[in-house]
């Protein structure tokens, strides 16, 4: 699963996801892509599940690019812990995704195979997505 090798700070603020994505919203590498339509935190497990689903469906041939990276740590407190005594320890990593962001790209396969693979990957995501092709 994806996670940063090292970070400047161990814990982050939660932040808020307002507006649309101005970066990473156009197809750069492949021919087909999956684009987010809603804001969400996507965990490294979800990213990996989507990537595996795509590679399994586009068997032999085809190249896949993952365009998001989980660089935000999410902290959790131990269960049944009283309030206070600081922030919890980092448990998992998420990628902050805004509407319009490209999640995965794909090329080297027929469009119907790409559609099928991307729809299966989309079912692993916690948000609504759309299939797009490069002009």
Curated annotation (Swiss-Prot):
Gene3D superfamilies: Ribosomal protein L10e/L16. One of its GO terms (biological process) is translation. GO terms for molecular function: rRNA binding; structural constituent of ribosome. It is found in: Plastid, Chloroplast. GO terms for cellular component: chloroplast; ribonucleoprotein complex; ribosome. Belongs to the universal ribosomal protein uL16 family. PANTHER family: 50S/60S RIBOSOMAL PROTEIN L16, LARGE RIBOSOMAL SUBUNIT PROTEIN UL16M. Part of the 50S ribosomal subunit. This is Large ribosomal subunit protein uL16c. The gene is rpl16.
């Amino acid at each position: 699963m994806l996670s940063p090798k090292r970070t400047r700070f161990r814990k982050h603020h939660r932040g808020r996801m307002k507006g649309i994505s101005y970066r990473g919203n156009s197809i750069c590498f492949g021919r087909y892509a999956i684009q987010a339509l809603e804001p969400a935190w996507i965990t490294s497990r979800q990213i990996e599940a989507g990537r595996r689903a795509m590679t399994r469906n586009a068997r032999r041939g085809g190249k896949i690019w993952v365009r998001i990276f989980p660089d935000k740590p999410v902290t959790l407190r131990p269960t049944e812990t009283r309030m206070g005594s600081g922030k919890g320890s980092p448990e998992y990593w998420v990628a902050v995704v805004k509407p319009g962001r490209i999640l995965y790209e794909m090329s080297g396969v027929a469009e119907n195979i790409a559609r099928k693979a991307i729809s299966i990957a989309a079912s692993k995501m916690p948000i609504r997505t759309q299939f797009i092709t490069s002009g």
